[in-house]
């Protein structure tokens, strides 16, 4: 490690949960760390900031870690909205403004990556770096969407009017079946109860149903597909440091395809975590946390160099 990197010094505070008014609702978030760059952790569906619980302790000594519960998820409010991707953009933007978060290192998975890509495309000067895994992108064909045919059939059902409502709103299948099936280790009852808690009723599960229907597959929905394509063009042109994690066989992307994807980006490192499916944070928290903590000095140095250029 170069002495010129001036890496952040280990200073951390214990994680603290806070609630803040955002637009017509509230958003809950976990914060840890006291100095260094701001590291923003963005989760996906149907999880919450809880999924970062074993990763943040590795990173907090080196940066200010903030992990929000997206609107409608975790302990955040559940306003009467459609919970489209663009709703999440609106609430996340307001959240960042409310906390006066400017320059960030983004860490994201699942729909958190779509939000991270969109933020980076619109405000590249605010992005210090991006670590991501199991990411959203435009899928030209259903065959491109998932590593497992059974999962493709499940998502087709979730996108079918009436069928999706039965599966998610009534049976809570995304939390009870999809989530644990996408983690290799056995989830404990206590762990599952945390993920169940935000969704006790059919009405509370609206956000969980909406996002599978927002997935840009075969050009639909058209507005999300167009934005995702735009954001990925911006991602390919960007020069900020990137770190892509993959598991084997993965879910949205396998390790070989992920390696090739990373090679097509500028300034992107790749880490194969080994056996893993979709929720890699639940199977490889320590490895992910250590890798991000080790990568932070590189991000700091890259941004210092840019400032001097």
UniProtKB/Swiss-Prot annotation:
Top-level lineage group: Bacteria
GO cellular component labels: membrane
Domain annotation AB hydrolase-1: ranges: 37-148
Enzyme class label: hydrolase
Active-site residues (renumbered): 110 (nucleophile), 134 (proton donor), 278 (proton acceptor)
HAMAP family membership: Haloalk_dehal_type2
Family: Belongs to the haloalkane dehalogenase family. Type 2 subfamily.
Xref: PANTHER family: HYDROLASE, PUTATIVE (AFU_ORTHOLOGUE AFUA_2G14860)-RELATED, MONOACYLGLYCEROL LIPASE
Subunit structure, as described in the record: Monomer.
Protein name: Haloalkane dehalogenase
Gene designation: dhaA
């Amino acid at each position: 490690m170069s002495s010129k990197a001036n890496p952040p010094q280990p200073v951390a505070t214990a994680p603290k949960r806070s609630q803040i008014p955002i637009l017509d609702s509230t958003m809950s978030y976990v914060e840890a760390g006291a100095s260094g760059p701001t590291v923003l952790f963005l989760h996906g569906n149907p999880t919450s900031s809880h999924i970062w619980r074993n990763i943040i302790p590795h990173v907090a000594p080196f940066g200010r870690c903030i992990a929000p519960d997206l609107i409608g998820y975790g302990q955040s409010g559940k306003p009467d909205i459609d919970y489209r991707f663009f709703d999440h953009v609106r609430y996340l933007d307001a959240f960042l403004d409310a906390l006066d978060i400017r320059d960030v290192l983004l860490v994201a998975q699942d729909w958190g990556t779509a939000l991270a890509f969109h933020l980076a495309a619109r405000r590249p000067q605010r992005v210090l770096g991006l670590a991501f895994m199991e990411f959203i992108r435009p899928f030209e064909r259903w065959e491109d969407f998932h590593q497992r045919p059974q999962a493709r059939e499940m998502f087709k059902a979730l996108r079918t009017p009436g069928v999706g409502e039965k599966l998610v709103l009534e049976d809570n299948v995304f939390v009870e079946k999809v989530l644990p099936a996408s983690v290799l280790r056995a989830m404990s009852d206590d762990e599952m109860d945390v993920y169940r808690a935000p969704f006790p009723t059919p009405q509370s599960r609206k956000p969980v149903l909406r996002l599978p229907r927002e997935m840009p597959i075969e050009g639909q929905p058209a507005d999300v597909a167009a934005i995702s394509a735009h954001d990925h063009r911006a991602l390919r042109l960007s020069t900020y440091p990137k770190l892509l994690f993959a598991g084997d066989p993965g879910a949205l992307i396998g390790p070989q395809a992920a390696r090739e994807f990373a090679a097509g980006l500028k300034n992107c490192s790749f880490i194969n975590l080994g056996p893993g499916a979709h929720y890699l944070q639940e199977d490889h928290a320590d490895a992910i946390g250590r890798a991000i903590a080790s990568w932070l000095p590189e991000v700091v140095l890259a941004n210092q160099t840019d400032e001097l250029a």
